[in-house]
């Protein structure tokens, strides 16, 4: 066997060894990434649960001072959950709810915008997406004041969200009532009446404030 053939065989064996070692390393690397992802997800879930518990206590507490303190602690836990898993929309929604409870509506809107934007929104079920859209519409309407372009913009944004809610959840009576209120603000009396009638079929108590 000549020197050239020996050299070719040596190179072939070396190449095969490199491929073998590389293929063996792939599962190990994948496992390492999966382990890191699972740790991040577990940590995010832990902070999310703590935050949800704090927000629940904030809503139930009779003392305004304690309630706000608990809501701010819920925001802090939500931030930790977001840092651990930025791709999960749930902590962003929790943060928005806690901020809204604390009276910080514009930051709450920004958190909901982030939760409802891709790719984060992919983690939401249709019902969760509908809930988040409904909350965003509620905040938009709570911020409505005065007249002019700003009023029109917020009402239009709320209408868009509420129409999306009803696509995901057609029997959501609260969304129908809010949509009717938006139509009234736009001066669309007949459309508002139609939506209120639909809401009445779902739950008459939802439109008791609209009577008269």
What do these predicted regions represent?
Residues 40-84:
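Alpha-helical segment of the N-proximal tetratricopeptide repeat
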């Amino acid at each position: 066997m000549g020197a050239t053939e020996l050299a070719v065989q040596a190179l072939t064996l070396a190449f095969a060894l490199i491929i073998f070692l590389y293929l063996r390393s792939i599962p190990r690397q994948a496992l390492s990434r999966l382990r890191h992802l699972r740790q991040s997800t577990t940590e995010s879930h832990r902070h999310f649960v703590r935050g949800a518990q704090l927000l629940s206590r904030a809503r139930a507490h009779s003392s305004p001072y304690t309630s706000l303190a608990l809501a701010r602690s819920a925001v802090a836990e939500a931030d930790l959950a977001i840092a651990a898993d930025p791709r999960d929309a749930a902590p962003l929604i929790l943060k928005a709810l806690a901020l809204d409870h604390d009276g910080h509506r514009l930051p709450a809107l920004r958190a909901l915008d982030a939760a409802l934007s891709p790719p984060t929104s992919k983690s939401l079920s249709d019902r969760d997406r509908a809930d988040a859209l409904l909350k965003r519409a509620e905040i938009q309407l709570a911020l409505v004041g005065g007249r002019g372009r700003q009023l029109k913009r917020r009402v239009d944004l709320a209408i868009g969200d509420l129409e999306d809610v009803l696509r995901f959840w057609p029997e959501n009576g609260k969304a129908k009532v809010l949509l009717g209120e938006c139509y009234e603000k736009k001066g669309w009396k007949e459309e508002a009446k139609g939506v209120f009638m639909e809401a009445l079929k779902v739950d008459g108590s939802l439109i008791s404030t609209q009577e008269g």
